[in-house]
Each structure stands twice: as C-alpha cells, then as structure tokens.
Amino acid sequence: MALLVMVYCYFGGFTTGDYVDGIEFKDEIVIPSDKRIIALGEATHGNKEFQELKLNIFKKLVEENGVRAFAIEGDFGGCLEVNEYIHGGSGSTLEAVKKIGFKIYQTKEMMNLIDYMRDYNLSHLDDDIRFYGFDMQRTKYLDKEYSDEDINLYLKEIKRQNKELDSSLLRDKYMAQNVEWILSREDKVFVCAHNEHVAKWGSYDSMGKLLSLKEENGYYVIGTDFYKSKCNLPFMGKRIVRTFYSHDPLTKSLKMSGKNVGIIDTSKLDVDYIYMGSLGEGFYLIPQSYRIFQPPKTMYDAMVLFVNVNPTDIIE
C-alpha cells in the first residue's frame, strides 16, 4: 500500500493521462501586429525553459512587432532600478536581477535577458528598451512611517470596509491598473507573469481577464505548460527540486510526436476543459494542488508546450 501511495504521489496518478489526436504543433509563433499588450505566462516559477522563453519571444517582438517595453511580475520600484541599469547604470547584472524583488529571478536565464536589453540599448540610443515591474506587494516602507499598532489598526479598518482585500483579487486588479499605466506611456508592451495572472479566463478576475475586457488594450496572451517538470521550489527555508506531471493531454500528445517543444493556436483546438500544470512558490504532493482543470481555448490565444522542463539554479 505504501508503495502505491508513493507511485501515486510521484506521478500524480497511476497513468500519465490522456492525449489528443490531430494536433498541429508549430515551431514558430506568429503574433498579430495590431496587438498592444502581448502577455506570456509561465506554468511554474522554477523552470529554466519558461525563463528562456521570455528572452526568445521578447527578441522576436522587438525585431518584428516594434515592442520596446518589457514588464514583469516584479517590484515596481525595484524594476525602475533595473531600467536604470539597462540604460548604462552602474552595478552588475546579478545586482540588477535581485532588484526585481523575488529569488525566482536570480538566475542565469534572467541575467541573459537583462544583458540583452543593456547591450541593445548601448547600440540603439534613440530606440531604447524600457523595463517595468507591475507587482504591488512591497510594503516595507510603511515600517519607517507607522508603528505596528497603527498599521494593524489601519488594516483592520480597511478590511472591514473592503472584504476584497482578503483575496488575490485586489492584487490582480492593481497589477492590471499598473499595466494600463505602462501602456499609456508605450505603444506596445510585453508582459510576463504566471499563467494564472495573464489568462483571459479563470476562477476569479485575474489581471489578464481585466485587461482583455478592454478592446483598446489589444490583449494577446500566450500560455505555457509541461508534461514533466523538475521544478525548483522553496521548502523549509531552502530550495529543493521536485518532479511533477501535469496530466495535460496536449503535452502528452507533444511527447508522442517526438518533439520536446511545440506551439499551438488554441482557436484550432477541439478540446474543452483539460488538466494543466500550475505551480507557484509552494506545493503539496496531492495532484489537485499543482493542476488546474480549465479550458485552454478560452484562457489563451496560443500556447508554448514542453515535454520536459528543468529546474532553475538560484544564484545568491
């Protein structure tokens, strides 16, 4: 019995899921030129391939779609310092990625992204790239202005007036507002965050859903998923690597095709609700905690799928 439980927890079941016939996997993604917000989601925060994809797609958008603004699920103020760095500011690339605000970005892949932007700007002084953060979770500055007693009193009153603060709804609402503020300064912007934040549909009003409701935003979203992920995650004060299977029939079909990477146009999918992988900065062994059961055709305009994705290495 113990062995069966171990097998179930490792694979997330006693099979690797279903597959779908007749899917056309492409090697290149074509992003419509009239879109103003192009969003890329990542199924996890702990895999190299999803971080590499940020750079690959951004390069394409710079070269083919005229995009010059990059925005990430990172600290708003810290990313202003990153923007200074890519415009020739002092410091190192590692120091710059640390300013984004989360350890998940302290990787070689993110450093490569920042280096590309800095190098680009050095040779394109009149056509530069800008870097933005649109998250709003940093509140340490409050400690300098208010006592713990004052902060707790204010929070209690605010929550009494607005119960929405007890959920992720407010965070996504403000992230959407921040992206729209960025868009007011830019012709187009490339937005990177977790799948759940950029999706056009979900169990709550996500940033992506709010942005997609306004036609003038020209919202286009690319989701990602994996068949098997060896994911870098925090656990009891350290980083560990754990293996997860998504049970996504699309990625299983990709595996059966012999490819490791494939791109699909979701409008051509003949599937509705399916399992997909979804990991944040935490996990449980039960499959329901790292899988979602949702309709990819409604959530995304396109998807980049991987069979195997490998763990990031966090640089201290």
What are these regions (language model features)?
Residues 8-316:
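Structured catalytic-domain cores with a bias toward divalent-metal coordination
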Residues 2-7:
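Gram-positive cell-envelope targeting signals
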